[in-house]
């Protein structure tokens, strides 16, 4: 049964119990390794195939695809995953002016060009670089992504520099 059919069944009451989907909402494309200052040792296609195999083995049904300030690789991964029954919510990771990292995900049908335009609306300090933060505070960024129709959440929030650790200290 396709995701759309399953979801339709959930909202129309065809199912008498809740239907849950196994999700991985912060999946990185092959180019993400560059953010860490490293070089990829396999091709993008090999990376995507390995990612797909790991996702299928884990029973993942939905992924959120996010790279730091970039949407490169979205289309290739989305096409491959959709062909294999996995829903892809494309997006990106971005840091607020306080350097809090957020994952921003959008409608599964958003094109990489539309995502690029959204990135352009988020006041990045250096749009061509994609790594530097936005001028927007966390609250402003959350509001703006919500206004655009996206879903935003704190990335790696339990790390030492994550938003939860900052809040508790």
List the predicted regions and their residue ranges.
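Divalent metal-dependent hydrolysis catalytic cores, especially in the metallo-beta-lactamase
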Residues: 51-68, 151-153
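Acidic/histidine-rich helix-loop elements
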Residues: 29-45
């Amino acid at each position: 049964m396709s995701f759309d059919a399953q979801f339709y069944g959930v909202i129309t009451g065809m199912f008498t119990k809740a239907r849950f989907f196994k999700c991985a909402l912060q999946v990185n494309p092959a180019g993400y390794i560059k953010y860490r200052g490293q070089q990829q040792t396999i091709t993008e296609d090999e990376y995507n195939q390995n990612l797909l195999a790991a996702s299928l083995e884990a029973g993942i049904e939905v992924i959120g695809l996010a790279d730091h300030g970039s949407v490169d690789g979205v289309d290739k991964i989305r096409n491959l995953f959709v062909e294999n029954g996995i829903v892809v919510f494309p997006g990106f990771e971005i840091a607020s002016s306080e350097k809090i990292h957020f994952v921003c995900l959008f409608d599964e049908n958003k094109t990489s060009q539309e995502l690029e335009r959204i990135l352009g609306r988020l006041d990045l300090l250096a749009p061509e670089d994609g790594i530097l933060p936005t001028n927007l505070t966390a609250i402003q960024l959350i509001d703006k992504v919500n206004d655009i129709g996206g879903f935003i959440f704190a990335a790696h929030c339990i790390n030492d520099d994550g938003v939860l650790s900052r809040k508790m200290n």
